From Swiss-Prot:
UniProt main location, coarse: plastid
MF terms (GO), sorted A to Z: rRNA binding; structural constituent of ribosome
Pfam families linked: Ribosom_S12_S23
Family assignment from sequence similarity: Belongs to the universal ribosomal protein uS12 family.
Functional summary from the UniProt entry: With S4 and S5 plays an important role in translational accuracy. Located at the interface of the 30S and 50S subunits.
Subcellular location(s) per record: Plastid, Chloroplast
Keywords on record: Antibiotic resistance, Chloroplast, Plastid, Ribonucleoprotein, Ribosomal protein, RNA-binding, rRNA-binding
GO cellular component: chloroplast; small ribosomal subunit
Subunit and interaction comment: Part of the 30S ribosomal subunit.
GO biological process terms, semicolon-separated: response to antibiotic; translation
The protein's name: Small ribosomal subunit protein uS12c
Length: 85
């Protein structure tokens, strides 16, 4: 977790990711709660987080080892959640 620039205040969830190309990047984990651990394999997309300096990537939820957000009802496709029955 890292803290955002002024005037915002929070503990934003981020992960250090080693890409297959050998680069080591910092990626943001969107949504509430996550299951990512030290050796999780994740898919990364571009897109910076404006109030987190140096964070230029997002982790894609709902693919590989990153599960979707639990109990999400709206805006589900961005968080890897199937339609509830």
């Amino acid at each position: 977790t890292i803290t955002p620039k002024k005037p915002n205040s929070a503990l934003r969830k981020v992960a250090r990711v080693r890409l297959t190309s050998g680069f080591e990047i910092t990626a943001y984990i969107p949504g509430i709660g996550h299951n990512s651990q030290e050796h999780s394999v994740v898919l990364v997309r571009g897109g910076r987080v404006k109030d987190l300096p140096g964070v230029r990537y997002h982790i894609v939820r709902g693919t590989l080892d990153a599960v979707g957000v639990k109990d999400r009802q709206q805006g589900r496709s961005k968080y890897g959640v199937k339609k509830p029955k």
